[in-house]
Amino acid sequence: MIHALNGKVESIENGKVYVNVNDLIYEIIVGDTGDFEEYINRNVKIYTKMVVNDDGISLYGFLEVIKLKLFEKLIGVNKLGPKSALKIISSNSVESVVSAIINEDVKALSSLPGIGPKTAERIVLELKDTIKELDVSINEKDRKVLEAIEALVTLGFNRNQAKKAVNKVAAKDDKLDDIIKKALRFLSR
């Protein structure tokens, strides 16, 4: 098994990142290639999961180990494949997905891309007891930052733009609406 790769990002194409590790180039399927753009021609550590199925052998990759752990949990759900699991992780924060599972919020889960009500119910049923193993505890500032990013995405901004803007303007004691206002000003420049 390959747990992680440390190498230089050669290129990014069609949801895949090509990483050069000692002159061996690995093709890694990633959810949001925008997260990797800043690493082109730079070294990066990517946490990976090798998946063997009818389509062949594939490597799925994440910049954060917590996303890898959530991916592993999700692909363990009956009838939920790696592509669907990747869509779930790419479309929302780990914290909000875990929170929806813990709170048995089938409606929130079924609003995610490619997830219908039956699949959402199956995710809750199969993961509600084990998902708590993921340490996704977040402090108040981080919670506000995540909520501000989600608000900006809802308003139509690209997730990467929203992350960059919120992280740039958020101060420790800011209220959520202040963070959003500052980020909107930053994005309108």
From Swiss-Prot:
Region: Domain I, residue numbers: 1-63
CDD domains: UBA_RuvA_C
Chain intervals for the UniProt region annotation (Flexible linker): 135-139
Transmembrane segments: none
UniProt family annotation: Belongs to the RuvA family.
Stored HAMAP family: DNA_HJ_migration_RuvA
Protein name: Holliday junction branch migration complex subunit RuvA
Organism, scientific name: Thermosipho africanus (strain TCF52B)
